[in-house]
Structure formats: structure tokens, C-alpha cells
């Protein structure tokens, strides 16, 4: 009888031990994603470009190689495209956004693009207003190619800084508790992280843009295309400070490498 009691007690202890160990492993996986998990793959994919941040001299992109596939023609060195856009709802039913895109052609070692000022409306029948100003990048400076009457706007364009010029993602691998979503049929992959207002990148964005909300932002890492690499898709990061109607506030940024003929 005593033997049976000891045997039952032993079995109970073993079952409890397995359960506790299993719980601990689940917690570790949530906190620190395993190598090969979707979250780890997304971080690895983004690290290929975000490790380049901050880019102190954008002309260094002429000497940077990127992911190459069959979409590149023979002899094409490729083109880097960098873009930053800030959008905010300043008036009921309206969204105002401003930003710049530059294409750094590694074949010609020239960089051209646009600064865009845009207003979109909630009303379906109301057309968006958009104005583009041609720019080029020379001697590590933005040069306006179009005449701009508004002196404040002119200064804003000439002194524009891309997020990639001052952002720092060296601790990306330590970001935890990401909300992961994906669809391999599309394919697309996303990881969202809640960031504190004390975060270095968040502080810099608040210094640079008229962000009025005190809410901590959500950082979204979005991949459109093959997670292992593709010149057809794109990778974009977005900081969403507010989703509230008539107070929406977000910044989007991307750095991508692709064939020159598609630019």
C-alpha cells in the first residue's frame, strides 16, 4: 500500500514538473522569439537595411550593394530608393502629408526625386490636392529644381532630413512582445511593437514633427514580398502616434534596393 502511494506521488510530481517546464518554455518563446520564427525572420530581413541607419552621408548609397535577383539586367548596379513621409489630420475630414523620395542610381551616380505636399479628404467625391517639387541630391545637399515662392516651404525642402539619416535601430533584436501577422499567399509579413516616448527614435520624431498627442506610438515593420528578399516587393516602417479620427498622426519610411530600369 505504501509503495502504491509513493508511486502515485512520484507520477504526480513528474506530471507537474513537465507542466511547469512547458509553461516556462512558452513564456521564453513569447519574450524571446526562437531563431526561425516569423518574428525573428522579419527582424532579420529588416536588419539588412536598418543596420545602415543612421546614414550620415546619403551619397554613400552609391557604393552600397543590395539584394539582387533575376529582375536585374546584366550590368545594372541597381538603385537605392529612400523615402520619408509625415501625415497628420489638422482639420476635420482632412489629412495633410509632406515628404520626400530620392532615387540613388548607382550606374550614373545621380540622385533625383520629389518633395510632395498632399491633402486628402474623407469625402469620396472630393479630389485630393497634390503638389510635387523636383529635387536632386548633390554634394550631400538637397537642391531644388523647381521654383518655390513660399520661402518657408523652400527652406523646409532644402533642409529636409530623411528618417534614415538620424534613426538608430541597433537594438532591434531586443524588441519584444511583437504582434505578428502574415499571409504567405500574398505574401506579406508584419510585426508591431509598442514603443515608449522615451525611445530615442520616438524622441527625434517628436522634435522634428508637430506631434501633439502624448500617446506612445506603435512601430510597424511591414514586408510586401518574399521575406528572404525580393526586388519586386518592398519593406516599410511606420510609427503610428494616433488613429483617432481627425487626429491621425503617423510617419512612414522606407529604404529599398531595386533594378534601375524600374525607377
From Swiss-Prot:
- PROSITE patterns found in the cross-reference section: PROKAR_LIPOPROTEIN
Asked if Membrane is a keyword of the record, the answer is yes
Say where the lipid (S-diacylglycerol cysteine) is covalently attached: 23
- Could you name the domain of life of the organism this protein comes from? Bacteria
Report what the protein is called.
Uncharacterized lipoprotein SA0402
- Positions of N-palmitoyl cysteine lipidation: 23
A Pfam family recorded for this sequence: DUF576
Q: Tell where it localizes.
A: Cell membrane
What organism is recorded for this protein? Staphylococcus aureus (strain N315)
User: Which parts pass through the membrane?
Assistant: none
Amino acid at each position: 500500500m505504501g509503495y502504491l502511494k509513493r508511486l502515485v506521488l512520484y507520477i504526480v510530481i513528474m506530471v507537474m514538473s513537465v507542466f511547469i517546464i512547458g509553461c516556462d518554455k512558452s513564456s521564453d518563446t513569447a519574450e524571446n522569439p526562437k531563431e526561425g520564427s516569423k518574428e525573428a525572420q522579419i527582424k532579420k530581413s529588416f536588419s539588412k537595411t536598418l543596420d545602415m541607419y543612421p546614414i550620415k552621408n546619403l551619397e554613400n548609397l552609391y557604393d552600397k550593394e543590395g539584394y539582387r535577383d533575376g529582375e536585374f539586367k546584366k550590368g545594372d548596379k541597381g538603385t537605392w530608393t529612400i523615402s520619408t513621409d509625415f501625415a497628420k489630420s489638422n482639420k476635420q475630414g482632412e489629412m495633410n502629408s509632406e515628404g520626400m523620395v530620392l532615387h540613388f542610381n548607382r550606374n550614373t551616380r545621380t540622385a533625383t526625386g520629389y518633395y510632395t505636399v498632399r491633402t486628402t479628404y474623407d469625402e469620396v467625391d472630393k479630389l485630393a490636392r497634390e503638389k510635387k517639387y523636383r529635387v536632386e541630391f548633390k554634394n550631400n545637399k538637397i537642391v531644388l529644381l523647381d521654383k518655390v515662392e513660399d520661402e518657408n516651404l523652400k527652406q523646409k525642402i532644402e533642409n529636409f532630413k530623411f528618417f534614415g539619416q538620424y534613426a538608430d535601430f541597433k537594438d532591434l533584436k531586443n524588441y519584444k512582445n511583437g504582434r505578428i501577422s502574415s499571409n504567405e499567399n500574398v505574401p506579406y509579413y508584419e510585426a508591431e511593437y509598442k514603443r515608449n516616448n522615451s525611445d530615442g527614435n520616438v524622441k527625434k520624431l517628436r522634435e522634428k514633427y508637430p506631434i501633439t498627442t502624448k500617446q506612445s506610438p506603435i512601430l510597424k515593420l511591414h514586408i510586401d514580398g518574399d521575406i528572404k528578399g525580393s526586388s519586386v516587393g518592398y519593406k516599410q516602417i511606420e510609427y503610428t502616434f494616433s488613429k483617432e479620427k481627425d487626429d491621425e498622426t503617423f510617419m512612414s519610411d522606407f529604404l529599398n534596393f531595386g533594378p534601375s530600369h524600374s525607377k
